[in-house]
Amino acid sequence: MALKKYKPITNGRRNMTSLDFAEITKSTPEKSLLQPLPKKAGRNNQGKLTVRHHGGGHKRQYRVIDFKRNKDGITAKVDSIQYDPNRSANIALLVYADGEKRYIIAPKGLQVGQVVESGADADIKVGNALPLQNIPVGTVIHNIELKPGKGGQLARSAGASSQVLGKEGKYVLIRLRSGEVRMILSTCRATIGQVGNLQHELVNVGKAGRSRWKGIRPTVRGSVMNPNDHPHGGGEGRAPIGRPSPMSPWGKPTLGKKTRRGKKSSDKLIVRGRKKK
């Protein structure tokens, strides 16, 4: 998809860009694959705020996505490419030979009418899902499982991809987009290709209201708060934070402080850590 630019007829339109949705072939979703998605506004079951900057936004329905790709031996035809308000990637509606319909994340280059399949014997082509042990070294993949049968968890957002680097015993070496090299069980599945909608990261929102339509509320700087609201708050005028390092609203060091818990069982599976920005 290409970027669409607007004439600067208002301050909100100036520099605003959006996607032209040229890849989208159908606007109405498949009813059998929809579920209600009630608003949470960042609150938990006690009504307490657990996620900041969430609230409002347009009503949405959840599209049930097949992350497991476990329907082996039955070919499926790509019926349409659709927009999904719940993720950055587009989704593709598959119609299997037995009549079942499922949504998958639409990889780059997937076309309407194309035939895809899952299983160890599937061909190495875009949209097919296979166990990692059956995918050649050097192949670009997405929607990668961390546990066999759990469903894809890695490389699912727009433009995301990983690469198979090698195979060692029951593990396969994968290079993630962050630069991290990780060992994953060879029986875990992944889908061939890169996630589509690559232009998503280039979109300029243009105005605050467009973020509100998405359910994103403003992010207020701690330095403009009061001392009882944030460790950076208080002082006369534009005062410095007065601490050795920046702090989170709850007084924990942030902006560079590592937050990964030590001695995780998966530490032994990380061959090389992610690249530093």
Curated annotation (Swiss-Prot):
Single GO term (MF): rRNA binding
Gene Ontology biological process: cytoplasmic translation
Record bears the keyword rRNA-binding: yes
Domain of life of the organism encoding this protein: Bacteria
Keywords: Ribonucleoprotein, Ribosomal protein, RNA-binding, rRNA-binding
Annotated region described as Disordered, given as residue ranges: 34-55, 213-277
Gene Ontology annotations for the cellular component aspect, listed alphabetically: large ribosomal subunit
Family annotation (PROSITE patterns): RIBOSOMAL_L2
Gene3D superfamilies reported for this sequence: 2.30.30.30, Nucleic acid-binding proteins, Ribosomal protein L2, domain 3
Keyword Acetylation carried by entry: no
A Pfam family matched in the record: Ribosomal_L2_C
Function: One of the primary rRNA binding proteins. Required for association of the 30S and 50S subunits to form the 70S ribosome, for tRNA binding and peptide bond formation. It has been suggested to have peptidyltransferase activity; this is somewhat controversial. Makes several contacts with the 16S rRNA in the 70S ribosome.
HAMAP family linked: Ribosomal_uL2_B
Similarity annotation: Belongs to the universal ribosomal protein uL2 family.
Subunit and partners: Part of the 50S ribosomal subunit. Forms a bridge to the 30S subunit in the 70S ribosome.
The protein's name in its UniProt record: Large ribosomal subunit protein uL2
Source species: Staphylococcus haemolyticus (strain JCSC1435)
